[in-house]
Amino acid sequence: MRHTLPIAPQFYVTAPQPCPYLAGRMERKLFTALQGEGAERLNNALSQQGFRRSQNVLYRPSCADCAACLSARIDVSAFRASRSQKRAMRRNAHLTRRATSPWATDEQYELFRRYLDSRHADGGMADMDVFEFAAMIEETPIRSRVIEYAHRDTRALIGVSLTDVLDDGLSMVYSFYDPDLHRDSLGTHMILDHIAIAREAGLPYVYLGYWVPGSPKMGYKSRFSGLEIYLGGRWQAMTDPEAHDAIRHPLSTDPIAEQVANIQLPDRWPTGD
């Protein structure tokens, strides 16, 4: 009889590069491959520890001199819509939702390009072509959905969210929308709709990605009640956004070896034949 040892995920660190959120800082990421029959379990386990998915990679910020990026999620049971969020829902009541398999379309890419050119022309995704866009949408080894929002009458595509379905919630991997309708608070509407989907499905959380204190691009996330942040190795309710100011309150940056050692992997990892 031949015995084989479990093949545990291998973790790596990217080279430092300019931070897209805070000027004058450098970012670095800890990452591992997401593949094989254990992909679903690994994604669930690491998402609960602040990791995010990008295609077939799971990553988490691991910067040498900064730890401002905080993984954020909404506790669906604790969420209560504010007045402005209720107005956003009313403004977008004419939109319909359609959930599909992760398959990229020309209409999605056209909307994606308009969104980037208007909102993130200097970002890391600005040069993404149609093939790279298709890879972002379609290369997923786990349960993913493309959720489209369209005008009820004209059928025009207004917004798109690439969403992963986790054991404990929905993870909004990437969202984009019609930049000409920015006054309609479409980004807020899509998050609110995901909260509704999660509630209907009995899922306790909606994962929003990273909240970065001091970054105008990420400030909107702190406006949702029921927000939790991953800090000190555990999820905790965020009570005061000002307490996490990126300049006044730099967070601890543990050595890479210690970070990897503290990662909790799934209890049962598949073995080779």
UniProtKB/Swiss-Prot annotation:
Enzyme Commission (EC) number: 2.3.2.29
Q: Which reaction is this enzyme known to catalyze?
A: N-terminal L-glutamyl-[protein] + L-leucyl-tRNA(Leu) = N-terminal L-leucyl-L-glutamyl-[protein] + tRNA(Leu) + H(+); N-terminal L-aspartyl-[protein] + L-leucyl-tRNA(Leu) = N-terminal L-leucyl-L-aspartyl-[protein] + tRNA(Leu) + H(+)
**Assigned keywords, A-Z:** Acyltransferase, Cytoplasm, Transferase
Sorted alphabetically, the Gene Ontology BP terms of this entry are: ubiquitin-dependent protein catabolic process via the N-end rule pathway
Q: Which SUPFAM superfamilies match?
A: Acyl-CoA N-acyltransferases (Nat)
- Asked if the record carries the keyword Acyltransferase, the reply is yes
According to the UniProt record, what class of enzyme is this?
transferase
A Pfam family matched in the record:
ATE_N
Q: One MF term from GO for this chain?
A: arginyl-tRNA--protein transferase activity
Task: Give the source's domain of life in one word.
Answer: Bacteria
> What InterPro entries does the entry give?
Acyl_CoA_acyltransferase, Asp_Glu_LeuTrfase, N-end_Aminoacyl_Trfase, N-end_Aminoacyl_Trfase_C, N-end_Aminoacyl_Trfase_N
Where does the protein end up? Answer: Cytoplasm
GO cellular component annotations of the record: cytoplasm
What is its biological role? Functions in the N-end rule pathway of protein degradation where it conjugates Leu from its aminoacyl-tRNA to the N-termini of proteins containing an N-terminal aspartate or glutamate.
Q: Which family does it belong to?
A: Belongs to the R-transferase family. Bpt subfamily.
- The name under which this protein is listed is Aspartate/glutamate leucyltransferase
Which organism is this entry from? Ruegeria pomeroyi (strain ATCC 700808 / DSM 15171 / DSS-3) (Silicibacter pomeroyi)
Task: Tell me the classification of the organism that encodes this protein.
Answer: Bacteria, Pseudomonadati, Pseudomonadota, Alphaproteobacteria, Rhodobacterales
Its gene is bpt
